[in-house]
Amino acid sequence: DVNKETHEVFFTHRGKQYSVIGDKVVFAVGRAGSRVFLDWCKRNGVACTNNQVDIGVRVELPAMVWEHFSKKIYEPKILYRSKAYGDTTRMFCFNERGLVVTENTDGVLTVNGHAYKELDRKTDNSNFALLCTIRFTEPFNDPIDYARYVASLANKISGGSVLVQRLGDLESGRRTDEKRLKQSTVRPTLNAVPGDLSLCMPKRQLDNIIETLHALDKVAPGTANYDTLLYGVECKYYSARPDCVDFEIKDCPGIYALGDGAGFTRSLSQAAANGLIIGEILTKK
């Protein structure tokens, strides 16, 4: 904890509690510490803005489908505005001949993807994230818990894992079971539980995802194939951003916030640059 009046910082190390006092205090907590930072802001009356979250799936398909893009572009990124709702769905985090993997964030399992540089570790599949951005309005103001709840439903339905479903089964209103998955021409790179994503993901997000896949199919034929695999759930959180001036929290003189944990950046490189900027600000003061 941090006392905003005295700048006393309380922490625990090896089971013992300590405290230090600094002229300047910087919150650089990362995404994993965003909840701790938000709780501190609430206790100290610091206004924060954040009312959106990205929820969707990890798409896996034969590498040849997007090969004509991946040979020219390191990472294809495409934004699509759905006709049904006007929501934005984005394709990003493209991994050519990569693997679908799981992430554990505070006990909630979600999906992600990566690819190895070594040729002998390449696969026959490529994968990418396909997420729908949802912006909430008042009175709801906890998008992170909303996303965690959706992801936890997938964990519960899958018996403590994540789900995988063929696109064709999803569109036909059928659950993908072990038998159907074995019939798929796309061999999964993650040992996920075959299931039905419509039982855990909201209809609006699923509609957006299906519509986007068919739009992508027009530029990369085969994207919306019956056997295209969808893993769920994948989430990207936007941390709450405090009211600041030059990263100094309003009404908290000498206390600063930066990086992903404070909602100012969305990547390691951006967070690192943010740290350099605050370093320059502090040295000038």
List where the protein language model places each region.
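Residues forming the flavin
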Residues: 1-285
